[in-house]
UniProtKB/Swiss-Prot annotation:
SUPFAM superfamilies: Intermediate filament protein, coiled coil region, Lamin A/C globular tail domain. The keyword Hydrolase does not apply. PANTHER family: INTERMEDIATE FILAMENT PROTEIN IFC-2, LAMIN DM0-RELATED. This is Intermediate filament protein ifc-2. Residues 257-400 are annotated as: Coil 2. Residues 20-55 are annotated as: Head.
Amino acid sequence: MSTYGYTHYTSTSQGRGLASGAYTSGFGGLVSGMSSAGAICTTQIRDAREREKREIGLLNDRLADYIEKVRFLEAQNQCLSHDIDILRRGFSGGGHVSGLYDTEIAQAKRILEQTIAGHAAFDRDIAALGSDIDAIRKKWIDAVNAVKAHREDHDVDLDRLAKVEAEISLFKRKIRIVEEDVIRIRRENDGIYNEIARIKQLTHNEIALKNERSLNVQDLLQRIKLLQTENSTRIEQELVFIRRDTTAENRDYFRHELQAAIRDIRADYEAISIRNRNDIEVWYREQIRKIQTESKPVNQDLYKEELASIRTTVTNVKSRLAEVEGRNFFLEKLIEDLRNNEESKLYEISLAEKDAQIARLREQCTELSIQMERLCDNEISLRAEIERYRVLLNGANVTTYVSNTHPSGVSVGGIVGTTRVISQTTRTNSSSNTSYSGVPASRTGYSVGGNIGGISVGGTIGGVSVGGNVGAHGASGHVSGGAAGSVSSLVSEKRPDRVHDEKGVDASGRSFHSWYLGTISINQITPSYIELKNICKIRRVDVGGFRVEQYINGELLGSAQINVPLILDPQEVVRIHHRHGKYLGQFFMDVDAFDNSTASRTSMYNYTEPNEERAWFVYLN
């Protein structure tokens, strides 16, 4: 019995070591490549294995205790048998002592039978646990094989996710650089404000000193007038005395004395006046020299121009700052929502049972592979959006410039040539009342991103990047780590576009038939232009990359493509003109005139699905 018990314990330990080694070799490279859901599942399996190991160890310890107890009872039985033999040889017949020994022997036999029965029960339990361990080991090996089968696909998917995360990190760094530039511009504006305040203070001080000196001059003039009045009074009194004196000698004497006194008074007055004038001139020269040394000479016209330029710069910077703050607030809110969704998914996954987690992990692995294929399919559109944002971010530091026209090549198919892009739409930001227009005329101010159809960075682009085309798959940048269930929730399914089939009568009374997918329709066709319209009343739509083609009896007349980022507001329209009216709008087709007869058919395509017709328009009469 003891030999069997220890042998079974050794084999069980070897089995555990083998399982542990298989686990280590099977999951050694998996932990780094699996999602957090796989890590949680693996941890729970490891805990269950450790718990089963501990239970088997306890059972083996109990078995060893029973074996030791059986050995002890066997030794005690031998001792009792020996004593009984001695007593039997020494005494004859049965007595009280013999009955006691018989009772002890019977009790020992019962204990031995109970021990044997317990041993058998433990053997059965060990056999049952061994079957359970084999079943669990089989499930675990199946899971390891399934994970190994998808490991290469996971590596490729992780590389793609790493690239997307790197691009997102690059955009975040560029956003931080723009924020630093905004802070620097604020600091420079504060310095300009301080300099203006200092100059104003100096001007006020000079005006105060001037007023004070003017008061001093008025004081001196009043004192001089008072002295003149007193002197005139004295002279008149002396003249009265002279007239009363009739002696010629006295008159001559007083005349000479009076003339001498007048000369002295005049000399003293002139000396005092010259001294005061010199003091005032010296003081004013000194003040002027001090002002010239402390501040540069300011031209009034130049000062007005610089003040107007500074005000324009401050207004533009404030508008850009408001747009960037609005966009940052919207992105922070989106990140918080995505984080909450991810935490809720992780919490739900952590509550699932072990078998359900294994099944869910397999389903999620399959779903992840499918979703990564979808991400690969959407990679072209995502790269286009990333390039668009890169252009916008690179153009965020463009300074004030004057622009007349902005030529750009528009690729056209069929029998068309090159075109020139001239923006016709005007965007107005409500936060700063600053318009960014691409109309072919002289314009000043801050242009963000060059000629991009008048789209401003900030609230405008922030709304597009989240609620527009990027909202369908832009969240893949946040799929780094976490459970596969979180990946499936963040990479949202693209909702199928709604099909519209309309018949009606236009303003001229002609019947038409229009069909389109989504919210962009061909609204009107005239000999001068083709009009596209966003029929949605609440959502803005990106029409960048859309291509319009016109056919006559099945033959291509011409085509034009919107090859710049263009966001249409709700109920907004954009027109494509013919070659003679290309200066009237931003886009044109290289044709003399558009055909709006019943033989013509106008179609629209998207750049993500260039061969799928998104809309068509025909006249019925």
